[in-house]
Amino acid sequence: MNDEINEPPPNICEQCLGDEANIRMTKIPQGSECKICTLPFTLYHFKTSKRSNNIIKTLICVRCATQRNICQCCMLDSRWHIPIQLRDHLISLVNEENVMTEEAKNDMMKRFLSLKNVKLGGAQITSDPSEADNIVDKLKNILLRATSDGPSTPLIKNTTALYKNEKGANEVKNLEKYASVDISHILKKLPLNESFLKNPSTKSFFLYNIDASIPEWKITDTVSQLLGIKKWKDGNSLSLIVNHKAKCGGLRFQSSELGERFVSKISETLVTPKGLKRGVLLIDRFRIFIIPWSSGFSAASFGTNTAENIKLSLSLNKLIQLELGLSFPTKSTDNAKNDKKKTSKKVHKDRSKKSKPRANKLTI
């Protein structure tokens, strides 16, 4: 009883509450599991108006929402109403320091983190009105400078390079940095030569091309919606592992029957140049590729340290680009460009030298 009395009010933004002056809200103590920390929390659900058929409910607990300064329903920043990754990225660019929200990887650490009285990532800024206004002023100044100086200023060039070339440049740097890391023992255990519909009786699957912005709970919800049930996980082992640094993970069902049902619900597939099929799981605007994993997996299947995780993600990036018929950056890209420039200069000089006598003959 005391816990219910001392419990803070829900943290719900004005956009989710709507324009109605009076809203009837239903409170259910320990009514759901938090999508972030996985602990039970007090669930609230309501309608924005009496005529509305859409029921809005809280997805995360008050503690996790306060730590990240986000709405419990839409999970957007409470002040700016944008995704927390976009918020953190903007603040990092303006302040020239990393303020990204680091999420825990396993359930135990998620629960431990939720009990701390801290502000994570950009919540340190947007939870303070003066700090948030300061960031907005800095952003306005940057935009004003960009529009007033013209398209040839270093600011515009740097900004363009950041969005167009940052991903490729970082990948080339990582290829060089982690070139000596050996992950052959990891790759040989991955089912990369398996085909999606070849062995549908398995209950385990390998997931790759997982974007860093996709949380684990969203994959769980998508699978639950596909199957039409919530209790599909294997209670005796880890049913879902997502390693965001490696950009891959594993999915395990209670039975092979559920695995077959999952395969039948996947409508989109990809056929690689080698003739192998990949299932495609659509989440938001991203495509996660799926392969049956008959041997199963463990937490160590994706690497035991950060270096192995990143090297695995680079190897899978190459695989994805090969399967999609795309080219991928290599170490020699910049050198090849420089050699091309040097060669073109030499040819230009030779041509100019040969053309001078011809010009003199014409003028005589």
From Swiss-Prot:
Example of a GO MF term: U6 snRNA binding
Main location: nucleus
Protein's cellular compartments: Nucleus
A Pfam family per the record: STL11_N
Key words, A-Z: mRNA processing, mRNA splicing, Nucleus, RNA-binding, Spliceosome
CDD domains cross-referenced by the UniProt entry: RRM_SLT11
Biological processes, Gene Ontology terms: mRNA splicing, via spliceosome
Biased composition annotated in UniProt, kind: Basic residues: 339-364
KW Nucleus (keyword) present: yes
Record flagged with keyword Plastid: no
GO cellular component: nucleus; Prp19 complex; U2-type catalytic step 1 spliceosome; U2-type catalytic step 2 spliceosome
Positions of region (Disordered): 331-364
Homology family: Belongs to the SLT11 family.
PANTHER family: PRE-MRNA-SPLICING FACTOR RBM22
Complex and partners: Belongs to the CWC complex (or CEF1-associated complex), a spliceosome subcomplex composed of the U2, U5 and U6 snRNAs and at least BUD13, BUD31, BRR2, CDC40, CEF1, CLF1, CUS1, CWC2, CWC15, CWC21, CWC22, CWC23, CWC24, CWC25, CWC27, ECM2, HSH155, IST3, ISY1, LEA1, MSL1, NTC20, PRP8, PRP9, PRP11, PRP19, PRP21, PRP22, PRP45, PRP46, SLU7, SMB1, SMD1, SMD2, SMD3, SMX2, SMX3, SNT309, SNU114, SPP2, SYF1, SYF2, RSE1 and YJU2. Interacts with SLU7.
Role summary: Involved in pre-mRNA splicing. Facilitates the cooperative formation of U2/U6 helix II in association with stem II in the spliceosome. Binds to RNA.
Additional comment: Present with 4260 molecules/cell in log phase SD medium.
Protein's name in the database: Pre-mRNA-splicing factor SLT11
